[in-house]
Amino acid sequence: LINYDGRIFIGVHVSEDGEVSGETVFHYKQDGIILSGTYAGGGIISGVLVGTVKKDDTLHFRYHHVNAGGKLESGECVSSPQLGEDGRVRLHEEWQMMDGQKSKGSSVVEEIES
């Protein structure tokens, strides 16, 4: 099982409609099956997420952030992990915004050295 506690991720690929970029840094915490985290950078001023870690290590969470335009955004995401040969985790994410146009897309975030 993957323990996400203390891991740091950075955006490496995002759909057109996404606000995450290569400048967005995610800090994850895990306590049992509960996942929480903070993120910021690029077009995101401040964000938080909370969710659960499933038995297959996938993440199911909701997120809220304030973007560079000062708008509050929220959505939900399912992230599937891929473990690299170097032991770093890469998360393949499918997300959907819950506000406004309810845009959806995919992104990839990759673990960096903490």
Predicted regions and their residues:
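Short, solvent-exposed aromatic-acidic interface loops
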Residues: 40-46, 65-68, 94-101
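Mid-chain, well-packed structural core segment of small domains
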Residues: 53-89
